[in-house]
C-alpha cells in the first residue's frame, strides 16, 4: 500500500458509494455503500481486509450522516490507513461544456456543477450534497471533481450537434454530451496495453453494458462519438431506458393516449428497455434465464438489446476508419458470454470469430481476448472508474 490513497465518493440521489483507492495500484483498501437515504432503514455496508460489515445509520439520514460515519467510525478505526488519504475524489455525472477535464473543487467549480444541474437533475444535486458533506468532514483535504462527460469533449461537432435549430445549441447547450466517460477512458487505456500499442495509435469501440449502457468510438485515445446524448436516455436499449426511439412517439403518447409529460419521462426512463419489452425484469441475468426457458418476452428483449448494440458497433467503424478491437465492460459486458457471442455473431461481416472457451472464461473480473487468433479482436476488460478518479486526484494535487 502506497501513501497515495484517495477517498472516492459517488453520490446518488438516495445512496453513496465510497472506496479508499491506492492511486498507484488501483487496489481498494475499503469499499462500501450507504443506501436508503431518507427512509427509516438507512444503512451502510462496507468491506475492509476481505471482511464485510454493516450498520444502521439511523432513520431518515442522508449523505452528510453517511460521510460523517465514514470519517468518525470506519476511518477512525483505521488510523494508519486514514493518515495516508491525500484527497477526496468525486464522481460527477454531468459537466456540460464547462468542464473538459478533472479539476480541484473550489467555489467556482461548485457553481459550475450547479449550472449543469438541469442536464442531470437526478445526479448533480446529489453530487453537490456529497461535496459539501465531504468538505465539512475533511476541511484540510483537497477535493477533486472527475466528470463522466469530460472524456467526450473531444468529439467533433458533426458528432455532437443535433439536427435541430442551431440556436438551441448556441443558447441552451442542447447537444450530445455522452456518459460513462471515466469507464471508457480506463478501458481504452487497458485495451492499448493488451494490444501492445501506444494509445495514440489505438482505435477501439468500447461497449459499457450495465443497467445503463453506452458505446463509444475511441480513436487514438480520444472519444470521437458516443451513443448517449444530452442525457443518458439516448442510444442503446438499457435495463429500464428505451434508448433510441422516434421522437414523435412522445407527441403521440401525450395527444393521442393522454399521458402527461411527466408520465412519458417516467415511462421512457423507468418502465422501458429490457423491463418494458420482456414484461419480466430489468436484470439481464433474469432476461437470460427467461431466454433459456423459452420466455417470449425475454427472448425478444435479448434479441433487440443485442441487435441495437451490434448496429451501433458497426456504425462506429465510420469515424474510426480502422478498428483494432471491440471491448466489452460493465456488469453485463464483463459477465454475459451469451450477449457477447450473440453481438459478435451479428458482426460477422467484420471478421469476428468467437472462441467459445475464451469467451466463457472471461467472466467475474477476468479480462482477456475472446476471439480466435484469426480475424478481428474482441476483448473483455473489467472497468475501474474509481482508479481513474484516484489517479486524477493525485495528479492534480501534485501539480
From Swiss-Prot:
One Gene Ontology term of the molecular function aspect: magnesium ion binding
Q: Which residues form a coiled coil?
A: none
| Family statement drawn from the similarity comment of this UniProt entry | Belongs to the acetokinase family.
Explain the purpose of this protein: Catalyzes the formation of acetyl phosphate from acetate and ATP. Can also catalyze the reverse reaction.
InterPro entries per UniProt: Ac/propionate_kinase (IPR004372), Aliphatic_acid_kin_short-chain (IPR000890), Aliphatic_acid_kinase_CS (IPR023865), ATPase_NBD (IPR043129)
Q: Which UniProt keyword terms apply here?
A: ATP-binding, Cytoplasm, Kinase, Magnesium, Metal-binding, Nucleotide-binding, Transferase
Q: Which organism is it from?
A: Shewanella baltica (strain OS155 / ATCC BAA-1091)
Identify which cofactors the protein needs according to its UniProt entry: Mg(2+); Mn(2+)
Q: Which domain of life is it from?
A: Bacteria
Query: Which pathway does it operate in?
Result: Metabolic intermediate biosynthesis; acetyl-CoA biosynthesis; acetyl-CoA from acetate: step 1/2
Alphabetized Pfam families for the sequence: Acetate_kinase
Cellular compartment(s):
Cytoplasm
Tell me the residue numbers annotated for binding substrate. 91
Cellular component, GO annotation: cytosol
Please give the name of this protein.
Acetate kinase
What EC number(s) does its UniProt record assign?
2.7.2.1
Gene name, per UniProt, is: ackA
Annotated residues for binding of Mg(2+): 10, 385
According to its UniProt entry, one GO biological process term is: acetyl-CoA biosynthetic process
Give the enzyme's main class according to its UniProt record, as a single word. Answer: transferase
Q: Which PROSITE patterns match?
A: ACETATE_KINASE_1, ACETATE_KINASE_2
How does the cofactor attach, per the note?
Answer: Mg(2+). Can also accept Mn(2+).
Oligomer status and interactors:
Homodimer.
Q: Which sites are catalytic?
A: 148 (proton donor/acceptor)
Q: Where does ATP bind?
A: 17, 208-212, 283-285, 331-335
Q: Where is this site: Transition state stabilizer?
A: 180, 241
Q: Main localisation, per the record? A: cytoplasm
Amino acid at each position: 500500500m502506497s501513501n497515495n490513497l484517495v477517498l472516492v465518493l459517488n453520490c446518488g440521489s438516495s445512496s453513496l458509494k465510497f472506496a479508499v483507492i491506492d492511486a498507484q495500484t488501483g487496489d481498494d483498501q475499503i469499499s462500501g455503500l450507504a443506501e436508503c437515504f431518507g427512509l427509516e432503514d438507512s444503512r451502510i455496508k462496507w468491506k475492509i481486509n476481505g471482511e464485510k460489515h454493516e450498520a444502521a445509520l439511523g432513520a431518515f439520514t442522508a449523505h452528510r450522516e453517511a460521510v460523517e460515519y465514514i470519517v468518525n467510525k470506519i476511518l477512525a478505526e483505521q488510523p494508519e490507513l486514514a493518515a495516508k488519504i491525500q484527497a477526496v475524489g468525486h464522481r460527477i455525472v454531468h459537466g456540460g461544456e464547462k468542464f473538459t477535464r478533472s479539476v480541484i473543487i473550489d467555489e467556482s467549480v461548485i457553481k459550475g456543477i450547479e449550472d449543469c444541474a438541469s442536464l442531470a437533475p437526478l445526479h448533480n444535486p446529489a453530487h453537490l450534497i456529497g461535496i459539501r458533506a465531504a468538505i465539512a468532514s475533511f476541511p484540510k483535504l483537497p477535493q477533486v471533481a472527475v466528470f463522466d462527460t469530460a472524456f467526450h469533449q473531444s468529439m467533433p461537432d458533426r458528432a455532437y450537434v443535433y439536427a435541430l435549430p442551431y440556436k438551441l445549441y448556441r443558447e441552451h447547450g442542447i447537444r450530445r454530451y455522452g456518459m460513462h466517460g471515466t469507464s471508457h477512458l480506463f478501458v481504452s487505456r487497458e485495451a492499448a496495453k493488451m494490444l501492445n500499442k501506444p494509445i495514440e495509435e489505438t482505435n477501439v469501440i468500447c461497449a459499457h453494458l450495465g443497467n445503463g449502457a453506452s458505446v463509444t468510438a475511441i480513436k487514438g485515445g480520444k472519444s470521437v462519438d458516443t451513443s448517449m446524448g444530452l442525457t443518458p436516455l439516448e442510444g442503446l436499449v438499457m435495463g429500464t431506458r428505451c434508448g433510441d426511439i422516434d421522437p414523435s412517439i412522445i407527441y403521440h403518447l401525450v395527444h393521442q393516449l393522454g399521458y402527461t409529460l411527466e408520465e412519458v419521462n417516467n415511462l421512457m426512463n423507468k418502465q422501458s428497455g429490457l423491463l418494458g419489452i420482456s414484461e419480466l425484469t430489468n436484470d439481464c441475468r433474469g432476461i437470460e434465464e427467461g431466454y433459456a426457458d423459452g420466455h417470449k418476452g425475454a427472448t425478444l428483449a435479448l434479441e433487440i438489446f443485442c441487435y441495437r448494440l451490434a448496429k451501433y458497433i458497426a456504425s462506429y467503424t465510420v469515424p474510426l476508419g480502422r478498428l483494432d478491437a471491440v471491448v466489452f465492460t460493465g456488469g453485463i459486458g464483463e459477465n454475459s458470454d451469451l450477449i457477447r457471442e450473440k453481438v459478435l455473431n451479428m458482426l460477422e461481416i467484420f471478421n469476428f470469430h468467437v472462441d467459445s472457451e475464451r469467451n466463457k472464461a472471461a467472466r467475474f473480473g477476468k479480462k482477456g481476448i475472446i476471439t480466435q487468433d484469426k480475424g478481428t479482436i474482441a476483448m473483455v476488460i473489467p472497468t475501474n472508474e474509481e482508479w481513474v478518479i484516484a489517479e486524477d486526484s493525485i495528479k492534480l494535487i501534485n501539480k
